[in-house]
Amino acid sequence: MASLKDMRVRIASTKATQKITKAMQMVAASKLRRAQMAAEAARPYAEKMDSVISNIAGAAAGSPGAPVLLAGTGKDQVHLLLVCTGERGLSGAFNSSIVRLARERAYALMNQGKEVKFFCVGRKGYEQLRRTFDKQIIENLELRSVRQLGFVNAEDIAKKVIARFNAGEFDVCTLFYSRFKSVISQIPTAQQLIPLVVEAPAAGSVATSYEYEPEEDEILSTLLPRNLAVQIFRALLENNASFYGAQMSAMDNATRNAGDMIRKQTLIYNRTRQAMITKELIEIISGAEAI
């Protein structure tokens, strides 16, 4: 059985840990609101841009001059999985849920005889994926030094992806990230970026015909690379909000668990101390009676 001194040290250590988790919870809560507002502000822009490009692409998809980012290579043999995770842990299942979705997709593709490559954005995703896919990770980009996420960060990632696509390194690119829903709910999401998936018009909707100047192919050659950066930027913002939401929830649970542990340890300490005092009193009384 542990001594009273060991118990006091353990209780003090748990209290110190509780202070840390409480502080981390408060920091995450303060950063969550701003991150949530940024993610929610980016959604309509990204969705509308995707919709507009899909509208233009619907007319240009079958033309011989359609941009390769829209038409694709004509094959789907080599898949690039662009996995965006966080730079830090202590955030519950935030990182592992994204990696799990990407890993499941990778195994499904490999079972079909496809080749899979990984482009990791974020240290935590890279650390988990390299255990099983070390030779298939072609690039790892960390954003630890970035104080404030900006569109320039997404543009940099998009340029690297497009450069590899133009070099013929892959046929299909799929983005993996966590969509923020609430503090307690973040949804791992997969979105195909290359070739662009053109959404079919809703059933019963009236198709609208537009005349474009310049031609659709020329417009798309400019918009498609930008749309790729926009979708990646949206994913980074969604990830940022999801991270702080998951961290706030995880640290709240950790703080509560620490409180429960402190109460249990204190109860054991008091009972042990009481038993020792009782034992000493019995020994004193027994000694006095013997005299």
Curated annotation (Swiss-Prot):
PROSITE patterns: ATPASE_GAMMA. Gene3D superfamilies: 3.40.1380.10, ATP synthase, gamma subunit, helix hairpin domain. Keywords: ATP synthesis, Cell inner membrane, Cell membrane, CF(1), Hydrogen ion transport, Ion transport, Membrane, Transport. Pfam families: ATP-synt. CDD domains: F1-ATPase_gamma. One of its GO terms (biological process) is proton motive force-driven plasma membrane ATP synthesis. Belongs to the ATPase gamma chain family. It is found in: Cell inner membrane. It comes from the Bacteria. Produces ATP from ADP in the presence of a proton gradient across the membrane. The gamma chain is believed to be important in regulating ATPase activity and the flow of protons through the CF(0) complex. This is ATP synthase gamma chain.
